[in-house]
Amino acid sequence: FSGLGSQNPGLLVLAK
């Protein structure tokens, strides 16, 4: 999810 998080920080939170 590194690429997605780069564009959308919110996705990183959901990924965790």
From Swiss-Prot:
Keywords: Apoplast, Manganese, Metal-binding, Secreted. GO terms for molecular function: metal ion binding. Signal peptide: none annotated. GO terms for cellular component: apoplast. It is found in: Secreted, Extracellular space, Apoplast. May play a role in plant defense. Probably has no oxalate oxidase activity even if the active site is conserved. Belongs to the germin family. Oligomer (believed to be a pentamer but probably hexamer). This is Germin-like protein 3. It comes from Betula pendula (European white birch).
